Amino acid sequence: MAKSRILKGDVVKVIAGSHKGQIGPITSITKDKQWVSVQGITVKKHVKPTNEDSEGGIKDIPAKLHISNVALQDPKNKDQVTKVGFEIIDGKKVRIARKSKTQIKTAK
């Protein structure tokens, strides 16, 4: 399994599936299954009432997308998606957008 170059907080665009074209920051990553959750992308799920939660019905639940179905949005040109590359700047390894050659700010 390859190491993911997309990190939590990166702004991504969905490139495949029913949510294709939607943009948002990554809220969580499951590394072993390679799933990501993107802010604002939800699925509707039918929930039956239980003893703890007496309210049933249709609820919006954050959708989990496979990491191959999202691509990093270019920080310089917001219309395009890009791949992630690495460069050594001042002795530190930093992530760069391959299309625009700009440094990607890491959200912490």
UniProtKB/Swiss-Prot annotation:
<comment type="similarity">
    <text>Belongs to the universal ribosomal protein uL24 family.</text>
</comment>
<dbReference type="Pfam" id="PF17136">
    <property type="entry name" value="ribosomal_L24"/>
</dbReference>
<dbReference type="InterPro" id="IPR041988">
    <property type="entry name" value="Ribosomal_uL24_KOW"/>
</dbReference>
<protein>
    <recommendedName>
        <fullName>Large ribosomal subunit protein uL24</fullName>
    </recommendedName>
</protein>
<dbReference type="GO" id="GO:0019843">
    <property type="term" value="F:rRNA binding"/>
</dbReference>
<dbReference type="InterPro" id="IPR008991">
    <property type="entry name" value="Translation_prot_SH3-like_sf"/>
</dbReference>
<dbReference type="InterPro" id="IPR005825">
    <property type="entry name" value="Ribosomal_uL24_CS"/>
</dbReference>
<dbReference type="GO" id="GO:0005840">
    <property type="term" value="C:ribosome"/>
</dbReference>
<dbReference type="InterPro" id="IPR014722">
    <property type="entry name" value="Rib_uL2_dom2"/>
</dbReference>
<keyword id="KW-0699">rRNA-binding</keyword>
<dbReference type="GO" id="GO:1990904">
    <property type="term" value="C:ribonucleoprotein complex"/>
</dbReference>
<comment type="function">
    <text>One of the proteins that surrounds the polypeptide exit tunnel on the outside of the subunit.</text>
</comment>
<dbReference type="InterPro" id="IPR005824">
    <property type="entry name" value="KOW"/>
</dbReference>
<dbReference type="GO" id="GO:0006412">
    <property type="term" value="P:translation"/>
</dbReference>
<keyword id="KW-0687">Ribonucleoprotein</keyword>
<comment type="subunit">
    <text>Part of the 50S ribosomal subunit.</text>
</comment>
<comment type="function">
    <text>One of two assembly initiator proteins, it binds directly to the 5'-end of the 23S rRNA, where it nucleates assembly of the 50S subunit.</text>
</comment>
<dbReference type="InterPro" id="IPR003256">
    <property type="entry name" value="Ribosomal_uL24"/>
</dbReference>
<keyword id="KW-0689">Ribosomal protein</keyword>
<dbReference type="GO" id="GO:0003735">
    <property type="term" value="F:structural constituent of ribosome"/>
</dbReference>
<dbReference type="Pfam" id="PF00467">
    <property type="entry name" value="KOW"/>
</dbReference>
<keyword id="KW-0694">RNA-binding</keyword>
